Amino acid sequence: MSTTDWNTLLPALPALPAQTRIALHAPTAQALLRARGNFKNLTAAQPEAEVWIIANAQAVQAVVDAPEAMEAALPRVLLCPNTLKNNGLSAPANVQVLPMGAVEALARMQADGWIYIRS
């Protein structure tokens, strides 16, 4: 069994730029749980990075059902208005809703230089 030499595999990776902006896409309840962990880890490692969780599809229902489960990430969660409308849901008072569908928002964010991560 061989060991991986991470210095060879990932040679001298530069630090993330100070203006790093990351969009964590969560389309399922399981992805939402991963996004919460990703958010926690990213903001601990890169406190100056701007990190948002974009929830659509089944992840929206998970946020609506238990917003408190998002813990510290809750102020950085954005819900898809299309999913809310199509499922007859309302966003909790303390949760933000995107001004457009999640897919369009993610496309625009990527075009504007955001890093996309599917959680």
Predicted regions span which residues?
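Secreted/extracellular ectodomain signature
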Residues: M1-S119
